[in-house]
């Protein structure tokens, strides 16, 4: 009976250690910036402070031509936004917090302003520069 209790305790401790070790490795997200929509983005391990994977798709309409770009990255926050008022720009951003969850923007994703997108992109660059 004492051996059974010891075995169960060891299994429980091992399970907790494995769960903690997996999270200590950090969230994994896809990462690329302003690339054509069909481009594959590599997977990266985020910093411990980054708890969200961000997926952003932008469609620019210039002279009746459409360009579709995407950004994928790790961030420490999920950016909030305001609807875009420019009819030549369509943008969708989503955030999630599971490994490699930012492969695509969900169809029901939120709409953000270009100003909000630029602000969060700029802030991530500034943070990376400072760190």
Curated annotation (Swiss-Prot):
Residue numbers with lipid attached (GPI-anchor amidated glycine): 109
Keyword Ribonucleoprotein included in the entry's annotation: no
Propeptide: 110-131
InterPro entries xrefs: CD59_antigen_CS (IPR018363), LY6_UPA_recep-like (IPR016054), LY6H/LY6L_nAChR_modulators (IPR051445), Snake_toxin-like_sf (IPR045860)
Highest taxon listed in the record's lineage: Eukaryota
Residue span, UPAR/Ly6 domain: 27-115
GO cellular component, one term: cell surface
Topological relation to the membrane, as annotated: Lipid-anchor; GPI-anchor
Annotated S-S bridges: 29-53, 32-41, 46-74, 78-95, 96-101
Location(s), subcellular: Cell membrane
Signal peptide: 1-26
Principal subcellular localization: membrane
Pfam families to which the protein is assigned, alphabetical: UPAR_LY6
Keywords: Cell membrane, Disulfide bond, Glycoprotein, GPI-anchor, Lipoprotein, Membrane, Signal
Name this protein carries in UniProt: Lymphocyte antigen 6C1
Species in which this protein is naturally found: Mus musculus
């Amino acid at each position: 009976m004492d051996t059974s209790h010891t075995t169960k305790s060891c299994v429980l401790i091992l399970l907790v250690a494995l769960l903690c070790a997996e999270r200590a490795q950090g969230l994994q997200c896809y990462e690329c910036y302003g690339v054509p929509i069909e481009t594959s983005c590599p997977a990266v391990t985020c910093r411990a402070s980054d708890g969200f994977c961000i997926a952003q798709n932008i469609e620019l309409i210039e002279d009746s031509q459409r360009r579709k770009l995407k950004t994928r990255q790790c961030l420490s926050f999920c950016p909030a936004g305001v609807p875009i008022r420019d009819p030549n720009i369509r943008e969708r951003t989503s955030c999630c917090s599971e490994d490699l969850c930012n492969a695509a923007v969900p169809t029901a994703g939120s709409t953000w302003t270009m100003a909000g997108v630029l602000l969060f992109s700029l802030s991530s660059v500034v943070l990376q520069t400072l760190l």
